[in-house]
Amino acid sequence: MRKNHLTPKISKPFLLFVLFSLSTFQYASSQESASYKRFREGNVQYERYNEFNTEFTFTKLDGFEFEKGVERYYPSSVIDVGGTYYMWYSKPQPNTEVVGPNSANDSTRAFHWDLSEIWYATSSDGFKWEEQGRAVKRGAAGRYDHRSIFNPDILIAEGKYYLVYQAAASLSDARWGKAFKIAGDFVPNVLGMAVAESPNGPWLALDKPILTPGPEDAWDGEVVHEPTFFVKGGQYFLYYKSDARLPWKPNISKGDFNKAHADMPLATGVAIASNPEGPYVKSKYNPVLMGGHGSMVWPYRNGVCATLPEGPERNSILCAKDGINFYPVIQGLTVPKGGGAFRPGNFVDVDVTQGKGITWGVGHALSPYYHFVRFDTDLSLEKGDRVRNEYELIQNYMNSGDYEYDASLQLK
């Protein structure tokens, strides 16, 4: 009698499971995950081998104790002139109440930054500061800088000192955002400049702004904010923030740009000039950083680095060799707000002398009142070289034919 050889029945779900498992195994063995690929391509590194691995610590400064009716904020970069540290900052007219743009007048403010002028302070050690007085005053009626000048930064070039700052012409330019009493901004909002042969002045303000908002359909069509400098290849890179792309109720300004850029509440662009006073030409690649609001830039090696307190890449450091194309190098930091770093060597051209990085600076804090804080960190070139050398030792070991790890190469 002939035996029946029955073929075992294979359920469809089991077959699908086997096929899925085989395909998954094949993919895992022949491909790399996105995270692992970024690591192997060198775009991310472990903390021990990342020259940007750091922490920011914050200390309250002496010399800026609480004064009723007085506010100071947005300090500039810090420079060293003859062994004395200098910084500049916004200081609104004392004892003026912030009442919002609908109620403000010549003695009350529309916003916290209204009725401001540029003041400065000096220090011998970076901890204890002494306010020296007003550096740049508001312009005469009818000028672009009549109502308020604020949020300064400093540049040293060609034997002169250049202060750049935001400027508002008139209270009539104050726009109410209606979200709350003091919401809104001056629209337009431009960048002005003053020049001096000494950090102590006297300062001569230029007759025209050095940068203005773009056309109505541009990403920076309303305001230009928070200027700061970097020098490369004989060119002056002026970074600036623009915002107010959110749909306001009512709209601060009309135009299609309110819709085109509604998902981009703030970003950073750059304008470049061969002369400190301009003319500045905005990069065709703008915006170059997606985020901003109290950002800080500094020269490092042959490029530039930046912190972003807000935006999709907030709490990070990003760097660009060309000053245009930034890539994140570390994330998850508590970065200074409105920070101005001490610029060792002041404003060197990084194509001539490598940027030395930063180790300290000054930022502002808003609570319990507007005041300055010192931040300390270690993003120095010296530390960066040391970390790179240590990483090179590991790479040499990985590529050597010897499996014995030389004790002399042990990292500290």
Kindly give the residue locations of the regions a language model identified:
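Bacterial Sec-dependent N-terminal signal peptides
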Residues: M1-E32
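Carbohydrate-active catalytic/glycan-binding domains of CAZyme proteins
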Residues: Q31-K412
